[in-house]
């Protein structure tokens, strides 16, 4: 609930469909970074996801119900607007072992897999898109999201433009819940 404050029992489950933490709104002791590692420079997008997997798998995560940052989706030149084909993403295979013993981590990563699969499909990289989609445990993704994945590319592009227009005008929603 929005008024909860304290330790989260399961960071990955709580972060679906939206992450409970953003890099600009967190406090992490330096000793945690020294043990888990810092951001990986080889990843140009998704460094925070990789970092949170390493941290939340080993340490408790607490949240506050106080607003400490705002995320502005409409910033035109933000890193998140970089086309997927120009990004160096996480290799999800790095987390295979942890996923096998942590179903909520698997679901969390499957949400990123379908997001990237959709982006690759929209970008015309159907081979990469299909590769990611095959690695998803289907019950981890809502039926509507799976159905959207199978829409033709031109329809996905049109729907994305509608979503961007709505978001810019204050209507935010997710296809992941």
Label every PLM stretch briefly.
Residues 2-85:
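Conserved nucleotide-sugar donor-binding catalytic segment
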Residues 14, 95-98, 165:
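Residues that form generic nucleotide/phosphate-binding pockets
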Residues 39, 61-62, 105, 126, ...:
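A general structural signal for well-ordered secondary-structure junctions
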Residues 67-75, 80-107, 126-138:
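Catalytic core of nucleotide-sugar-dependent glycosyltransferases
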Residues 109, 113-116:
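Structural register within alpha-helical repeat arrays
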Residues 125-177:
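Membrane-interface aromatic/basic loop that binds lipid-linked glycans or pyrophosphate carriers
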């Amino acid at each position: 609930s929005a008024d909860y404050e304290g330790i989260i029992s399961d960071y990955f489950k709580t972060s679906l469909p939206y992450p409970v933490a953003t890099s600009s709104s967190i406090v992490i002791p330096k000793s945690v970074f020294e043990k888990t590692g810092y951001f990986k420079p080889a990843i140009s997008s998704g460094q925070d996801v990789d970092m949170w997997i390493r941290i939340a798998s080993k340490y408790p995560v607490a949240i506050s119900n106080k607003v400490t940052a705002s995320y502005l989706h409409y910033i035109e030149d933000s890193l998140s607007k970089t086309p997927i084909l120009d990004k160096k993403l996480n290799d999800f295979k790095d987390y295979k072992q942890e996923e096998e013993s942590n179903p909520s981590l698997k679901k969390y990563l499957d949400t990123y897999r379908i997001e990237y699969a959709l982006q690759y499909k929209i970008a015309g990289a159907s081979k990469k898109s299909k590769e990611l989609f095959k690695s998803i445990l289907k019950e981890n993704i809502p039926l509507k999201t799976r159905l959207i994945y199978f829409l033709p590319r031109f329809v996905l592009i049109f729907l994305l433009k509608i979503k961007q227009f709505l978001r810019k005008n204050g209507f935010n929603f997710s296809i992941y819940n």
